[in-house]
Amino acid sequence: MIYHRIAVNVPLSDGLLTYSHSEPLPPGTRVLVPFRNKTVVGMVWETDIAPDMDAARILSVQTVFVEEKPLSQSWRDLLAFTSRYYHYPTGQAVFAALPQGLKETRAVEMPQPPLFYALNEAGRAQTPPPARFNKKAALWDALLSGEMTMAALKQANAQAAKLIEDWAEQGWIETTEAAKPVLRPYRGQASHSEFVLNTGQQKASDEIQTALGRFRSFLLYGITGSGKTEVYFDAMAKVLAQGRQVLFLLPEINLTPQLLKRVENRFADVPTAVLHSRMAAGRRTQDYLRAMLGQAKLVIGTRLAVFTPLPDVGLIVVDEEHDGSFKQDNELRYHARDLAVWRAKQGGCPVVLGSATPSLESWHKAQSGAYRLLQLTERAHASAQLPQVDILNIGRLKLDNGFSPQALQLLKQNFEAGGMSLVYLNRRGFAPALFCGDCGHTFGCPNCSAKMVLHQRARQLRCHHCDHREPIPFKCPDCGNQDLTAVGHGTQRVEETLRAFLPKAAVVRVDRDSTAHKNDWADLYRRIANDEIDILVGTQMLAKGHDFARLNLVIVLNADGSLYSADFRAPERLFAELMQVSGRAGRADKPGKVLIQTQLPEHPVFAAVKAQDYAVFAENELNERQMFAMPPFGFQTAVRADAPRVADAMEFLNAAKETLAPLLPESVSRFGAAPMLMVRLAERERAQVFLESTSRQDLHRAVSLWVQVLQQNRDGKIRWSVDVDPQEA
């Protein structure tokens, strides 16, 4: 018998178990193995090993999926690194990185190579369709130009499938399964103004292209509207024309439809895979496998796509690299941006991190020379100007449901002038809280230490942390008062205020509640493109990367909230949020205006936003962090525990802390145990210990010791986790 180490999705120390098989199995092969009286999926990690246990106790592999291609050594190296760095069992890390189809106990069908269509010799001898049949003629010209996929042909003519079927019956079409040696992303459109870069864009793209074929990290810092996407696309075109693969990571699912439209216009004949959580499981698995087999040349996805196996990656792009969505906040707590840089080094290719407001970690690396800084200082359209930003002190103003008189006047003027406006606040629901004016009672979530949010249309109170829901009460449970008051300004309340103030305006609310379905974003883009919307009411998701050409006024209602946070990253996040949302104004050739309402107008964040000066803000913030050895000058790990009572969680962490005190490196500081800022979540109470050090190596040694002690926990009431490079306090 041959013995193998098999990765299994179980919370053991490393998740690797020993099984036997009559033959050596290639590492990366998917198998079925017995585990605790059931059959589970496993993946061969090592083969032909010497077992460290009694051979009589070793169980046999039950099924080998021989028709499936094993996952590559480079993919397994990525998961091994991820497991080590984030101190997470290898077996569980492997299965966190796989699509649903590869986690199931049945075989998956491997995707077939794409078909390519062209006119054969007989077809080329035919008379082309008359020019008056312009779409049919366009399809014929496309087939004349060489082998093309059906997706690309449908760009020329939506009826391509039917026409090609007809022409094939005439004996004019040839099909091949072979991948084209050269992809042509510029087909017939090189002179299109959208693809012509300005001087700054061309310089940035040229520098990226000089690094093709070797590892180099670039930080592409460009003001909003400077055309970072065009720089990405220009560099991507060079890689795709070589037949190599590109990985393009986005922070949010809702950015995907807009990007895909641009990809279809620019790279119509490039086989593309799209990977995000709202895709059907079967489609996502097939796209994953197409990428693994090298059939998909362009892979676009959210954070989990960083684990997509790519046999011939030539470029990795991380758009909006500062965005917190790239950090997974449960189970395998990885950061996709950081893993993308590691993958680029592993694959020997450039990685481009792009943002108008880079993370301070990336900016610091660019300033220190670890990353090459590329800057776009002008908007892509020569006529486009940066928006005028005004900071309004609302401390003594009377507000109408959150709106100052100045804000309402600007909205009215812009509507009458035919412009589009965005009213921005980072709060879903009708109002943040329901309040009893007689006794002061507020309605808290029974499962969390958070207030319930009033959703008027659904007639519900909801917790935005654990999703607990209950009907709106008729009276106060403490004093019986029936006159309950909604306090605060959520998107639903703002929407209703605007409808009453401007009844003729088309007001559309955009938040997670209103975009929960698959096609909601595509429908929104269609309505905006057709000038069917006058005012958008939005939350944070509207601040990210969207390009709405007609938008020329942004009103920010509640800019102060995050500044009261205990999180040291709060100013950085607020600055990025305000800069990003301000950048939505004045795209294309329309001058933009931004009005930010605040009760803290003297705060340095607002001065930096008004000046539109990221570099000054970053320098000041980095100087402050350096004084206290905070990231990026120091490194952090949060060790967390939760239990029915916070006292139990703290006792568990403090016991481990006491055990480890004499063993930890002196360079590692320990803070806590202390309750988390939101103590109660989903009927569990949480505490944490922060480990900090200026030595990443010493910190990881300390975390390894902590994990060894925590793994000895046998108290079923206690759950623990480790968060390396945490983004939340």
Swiss-Prot record:
This is Replication restart protein PriA. Binds 2 zinc ions per subunit. One of its GO terms (biological process) is DNA replication initiation. The lineage of its organism: Bacteria, Pseudomonadati, Pseudomonadota, Betaproteobacteria, Neisseriales. Its cofactor is Zn(2+). It comes from Neisseria gonorrhoeae (strain ATCC 700825 / FA 1090). NCBIfam families: priA, PRK05580.1-4. One of its GO terms (cellular component) is primosome complex. Zn(2+) 1 binds at residues 436, 439, 476, 479.
